[in-house]
């Protein structure tokens, strides 16, 4: 091999090595830049979320209050929030349901409050003070999905007003084999004693639920949808009481779907609104009021929103015929029983069966 050829070969190898090193350095630099940009993006996202939470808290906190009361065992305290400008507020039944001598801490002062309504089936209560107040806007829990971010504001333990941030973990109709009276939202949201009755807010600052119980060592909690409380408030405005409706049907799983529904009428109780309307065992239930039915469990939500005395359209499939009956609902037999409805074959549960009360029990003062 000539010296010129050897020199040229060595030069090419050296140049290739230098080029490879430059490319490697460039690749490393690009990767470092990409990692930095991703970290910066995450930091900016976290900052944006933090600002959003602060904004929700700043706008909503002035309408959230601490509630004191006394029941037959001890003093209690929990959280509530105003829903109109005339001093009406929502809280959890465990706070405002069975206690009395209520005092509300609002705007740096204490005000006496009275109970308007306590409904054990929904797990909610309404109190009122005679003052002009701010009010939280009402949202729609139906717009929430699993992993939707949410904020609660409450008074944990004996601490000041505190925001909590988490997300929707699920929509449950039962807990430990026993059914709720309506679907509850399970939240990856830490909750302590004293936070029962706290508003659950979407990122617009609208109320979408009320915190009612805690789970898993306070790392998660349940909230009842705001629509359930609004249903009870609507009853109160019309009748002065909660009026849970009932039509008198039992449903079970059909062998095969009919028009998309597996809910088959298995029993029509005698002398009930359903029996008088002409509904029969064997009919496949498609819709109750505005609620579509596809599974037997759908009847829980559908029936919860029925008001006694109202005429409710009930649509069924009977053979090849789609029929709609007008059924006038009567008062639900369980209107004054437990918050949790028992599953078939299990004993009934009352509100004390909720995993953990979130109210704070305080030893009575001498």
Regions found by a protein language model. Give the residues of each.
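Bacterial N-terminal signal peptides that target proteins for export
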Residues: 1-7
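Active-site region of chymotrypsin-like
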Residues: 61-63, 70, 125-136, 162-219, ...
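Conserved active-site neighborhood of the chymotrypsin/trypsin-like protease fold
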Residues: 66-77, 82-162, 190-193, 258, ...
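N-terminal activation segment of mature serine protease catalytic domains
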Residues: 21-82, 88-93, 101, 124, ...
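Bacterial N-terminal signal peptides
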Residues: 8-16
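PDZ/PDZ-like groove recognition
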Residues: 25, 186, 190, 237-302, ...
